[in-house]
């Protein structure tokens, strides 16, 4: 398992303590420090000394955003499976055991990995449970009415067979579903209808600041919108991606956006709606800066 973190020393201990409590210690915790200037490094050094029955690896890098943390992690991971546990989240005491035992019984090269449940601290499932069948793609789950964040456990060999997340100068965010959507074209995920992660959405987390992310990272979002235009199965989802693509293109003043779009006619139809979204994003960011 790996955890990208940036200035989260104040909350990272919660994740560490949940790993100490694991009923199965057959895992490595890889911490990707994305340029923290708090005492994260010192904390981790102490945890390594504690020798709690599992290996801790620490890797420091210059700040680049969550997707660059994933790029760094995928280069370093050498286990068969990998799962990202965010710095403000933690695992139920039996999570590693659930994952490893389930994979031993059901895993094979046919699947890209496992999709499992995220829950809130009160035990409530985020969104909805997974369908009562053996496997699904991530995009197929959402296309068929699935809701809420889910925990994705991927085969390292599979996730590394797809291109890295692109890194755009001056930007700090590219949606993580880039690799997941590519994997969906070739594999399905085994369904594990059990909770393996307890989620807490922090005020300083990326999920809490989406309009600001749109404004600050238009190249990253526009890149991902083009990927969705190509691979999304539903027409309405392709059209929504065109709207967001137009908005992002206006933010970064890309005059060639129509030429560069993989769905030119649909992008043209989406233009008025994209302008409206662009104005909303601008207004929200001005309000946030006030």
Predicted regions and their residues:
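Short aromatic/hydrophobic "clamp" motif used to bind/position activated sugar donors
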Residues: 82
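Glycine-rich, basic loop-to-helix element that forms the pyrophosphate-binding segment
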Residues: 61-77
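A conserved acidic beta->alpha catalytic loop
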Residues: 18, 33-43
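Short, well-formed alpha-helical segments that are part of the catalytic scaffolds
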Residues: 7-21
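Catalytic core of nucleotide-sugar-dependent glycosyltransferases
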Residues: 209-235
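Conserved nucleotide-sugar donor-binding catalytic segment
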Residues: 120, 124-208
């Amino acid at each position: 398992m790996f955890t990208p973190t940036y200035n989260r020393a104040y909350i990272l201990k919660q994740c560490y303590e949940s790993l100490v409590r694991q009923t199965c210690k057959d895992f490595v915790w890889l911490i990707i420090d994305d340029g923290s200037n708090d005492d994260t490094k010192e904390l981790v050094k102490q945890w390594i000394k504690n020798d709690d029955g599992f290996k801790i690896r620490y890797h420091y890098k210059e700040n680049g955003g969550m997707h660059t943390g994933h790029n760094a992690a995928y280069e370093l991971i050498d286990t068969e499976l990998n799962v990202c546990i965010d710095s403000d989240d933690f695992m139920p005491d039996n999570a590693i055991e659930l994952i490893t035992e389930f994979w031993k019984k059901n895993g094979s090269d046919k699947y890209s990995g496992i999709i499992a449940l995220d829950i809130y601290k009160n035990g409530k499932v985020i969104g909805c449970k997974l369908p009562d069948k053996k496997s699904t793609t991530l995009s197929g789950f959402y296309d068929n009415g699935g809701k809420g964040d889910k925990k994705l456990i991927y085969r390292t060999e599979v996730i590394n067979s797809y291109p890295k997340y692109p890194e755009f100068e001056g930007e700090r965010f590219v949606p993580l579903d880039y690799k997941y959507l590519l994997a969906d074209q070739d594999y399905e995920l085994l369904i594990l209808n059990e909770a393996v992660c307890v989620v807490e959405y922090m005020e300083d987390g990326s999920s809490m600041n989406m309009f600001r992310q749109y404004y600050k990272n238009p190249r990253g979002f526009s890149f991902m919108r083009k990927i969705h235009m190509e691979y999304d199965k539903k027409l309405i989802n392709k059209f929504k991606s065109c709207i967001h693509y137009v908005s992002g293109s206006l933010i970064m003043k890309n005059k060639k956006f129509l030429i560069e779009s993989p769905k030119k006619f649909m992008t043209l139809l989406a233009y008025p709606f994209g302008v409206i979204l662009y104005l909303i994003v601008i207004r929200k960011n001005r309000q946030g800066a006030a």
